[in-house]
């Protein structure tokens, strides 16, 4: 009996060591989403453990305003559904989650996970030959759940009931040091989910942190494992990486660790030692523009970003088809567009709504060459004209020469009145008159007279 009491006392001491008063970091329930607090409170009233978890706590500790609030609990998905009824929707097969709906606001609730080696059957956990977790639904305790998190700075739990934090892997200490550290063996954790390599880059750029050496070293060697990730998931991850406001910084890090070519293998042929090819300069120019738009809280369109990324590979393919296949400009663009988008979507499965816009932006580059007659007004009426013009302006910055003159003309045309526009068109017609059609005299048909 005394032995059991001693064991319990040891657990209590270990537990208390990991429980920290949130008030010392100026954190209180008012910093959290009302809906997330309601979910935690309802689960706790039903006798379950429940905490607000992960990135929102990390962001609050860094003085940032969180965007999302997630909850972790020891309630199973079916139990969560019984509590929240029609307000709850269960999602995911690989990683079973509950979404609690508050109108347009969704609170994601996950059941505490244990090590997948504790699984009793393949319905709970399953791994591929490369070590990737195909299913991860082994449930456990809060301590086990913390060990399943990716980085120490994300393994933080908040209990609004007593305003305390739980930190099992010194995440707060790492956060103060600006250090990203994987929980567990880095090789194993990257093999379990190769997307963790991309998450490490995203957090380095977003949080301005460094990746500790043991977590950093395996990335370049394990980068090819990203080929095992479904292209649709990689597309979503690419948006998180490149459209969060740190696109240029993220791109540099992805190149540094050999990850960019895994996401965009069709672009790797255009990489140079000095990183100064037209394609590389376009990537940086497009990402700089995206970062500025995010900072200004303007709308961003992923289709524009990828249309810019693949513009020079498209141009190269167009010239090949024209020179070797004898195709006209329009047909060469259509066929080249199909081939380039096919290569893009093999790695990142972009939805059709995006690929359709990418095509529009590319074809507008042809239309922008037409500056006489009624063509300019028809081009300006195209729904994607502004995106097409923005790509032209970026090309002018990179290519110089005639492209600068073309971009200037269209800038002036957009902001001119009717009379000024007509003058601009007439000037173009004077500079580039249509060749006169040659008049061919019809030949007289020869008639053959039969001899009588």
Curated annotation (Swiss-Prot):
Tell me any Pfam family this protein matches: PolyA_pol_arg_C
Q: Which residue stretches does the UniProt record annotate as biased composition, category Basic residues?
A: 431-452
Record's keyword terms, sorted: ATP-binding, mRNA processing, Nucleotide-binding, RNA-binding, Transcription, Transferase
What are the start and end residues of every segment in region (Disordered)?
A: 427-452
User: Active site annotated at which positions?
Assistant: 68, 70, 150
Recorded GO molecular functions are: ATP binding; poly(A) RNA polymerase activity; RNA binding
**What Enzyme Commission number does this protein have?**
2.7.7.19
Against Gene3D superfamilies, the record matches this protein to: Beta Polymerase, domain 2, cca-adding enzyme, domain 2
Q: Name one GO biological process term.
A: polyadenylation-dependent RNA catabolic process
Q: Which InterPro entries match?
A: NT_sf, PolA_pol_head_dom, PolA_pol_I, PolyA_pol_arg_C_dom, PolyA_RNA-bd, tRNA_ntf/polyA_polymerase_I
Catalyzed reactions = RNA(n) + ATP = RNA(n)-3'-adenine ribonucleotide + diphosphate
Q: Does the keyword Repeat apply?
A: no
Q: What job does the chain carry out?
A: Adds poly(A) tail to the 3' end of many RNAs, which usually targets these RNAs for decay. Plays a significant role in the global control of gene expression, through influencing the rate of transcript degradation, and in the general RNA quality control.
Q: Which family does it belong to?
A: Belongs to the tRNA nucleotidyltransferase/poly(A) polymerase family.
HAMAP family recorded: PolyA_pol
What is this protein called in UniProt?
Poly(A) polymerase I
Q: Which organism is it from?
A: Haemophilus influenzae (strain ATCC 51907 / DSM 11121 / KW20 / Rd)
Starting at the broadest rank, the lineage of the source organism is: Bacteria, Pseudomonadati, Pseudomonadota, Gammaproteobacteria, Pasteurellales
